[in-house]
Amino acid sequence: MNGNNLSFNNLDWFSPEERFNQPGSFAIVEDHQIKAILAATPENPSTAWLRFYHVDRRSDHAKCFANLIGAAKNTLQKMGARGLFALAPYSWLESLLLAEGFKPADTIVTLQRDFPVQSTPENDDEIVIREMTQRDLVVVEEIDAAAFEPAWQLNPVSLERTYHRTAWHSVALLEREIVGYQMSTSIFDTAHLARLAVHPRYQHRGLGRRLAQDMLETFSAFGVTSFSVNTQSSNASSLALYQSLQYQRENHDILVMSLDI
């Protein structure tokens, strides 16, 4: 395929080449050329996501999408998946998804904070924040599965990839037990809180705030001045947390769509 095409890539820690080697990936080939290519691969046994879709503009992109998403659905059904989710940042993609029976499910919102934070001493000696190690991932996987609904969970492979691709990752401990974690990326003077979760048994005790504050303080110490985070518009507690840390909601929400399969 060349640059004359419609393209969508999901927010992902894996490359399109890696995704295309997973079940749920298909291509349409004509005259030895790829006309359209799609990956809709599982994240866990019950849930899959549309990872990417590329189609030559000169092709019937609606027909191509219908054929490819249909093939992916058949594969996912055989694997036991019950839901297929997709981000729809473009109107053309939203139209294609609606035509195949997808419905609006939620909205991803971005929040931004454009000034650093000063380190402040914490009075709660019960909570300990330390750097995450790879050995912690076994517990982090359990926390992630407990804290998120299936559509938003990351499987162990994805969590390990996230760990290796993020610049700062930390865990929160209560009585020497890991009960929460965060992973964040950074480039130049910007940082992004990519993942934060607290085990449901320990939520509403200030752990999420301590982890988010740790991210701000760590990157601020290295000269970072701009911070961002994404969450769902339906997640009121998450929105309240970030806004209490002076993040401001941006005006470029992304629609989340879902299909029962």
Where are these regions (language model features)?
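A short beta-loop-alpha structural element at the N-terminal edge
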Residues: 1, 127-140
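A structural microfeature
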Residues: 36, 106-109, 180, 251
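Conserved donor-binding loop and adjoining core beta-sheet/short helix segment
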Residues: 11-70, 74, 174, 182-194, ...
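Active-site rim helix/loop that mediates acceptor-substrate recognition in acyltransferases
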Residues: 2-30, 148-175, 183
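Conserved active-site alpha-helix within GNAT-family acetyltransferase domains
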Residues: 89-106, 205, 209, 233-251
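Conserved acetyl-CoA-binding loop-helix of GNAT-fold acetyltransferases
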Residues: 61-74, 198, 204-217, 221, ...
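Acyl-donor-binding surface of acyltransferase catalytic domains
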Residues: 56-124, 253-259
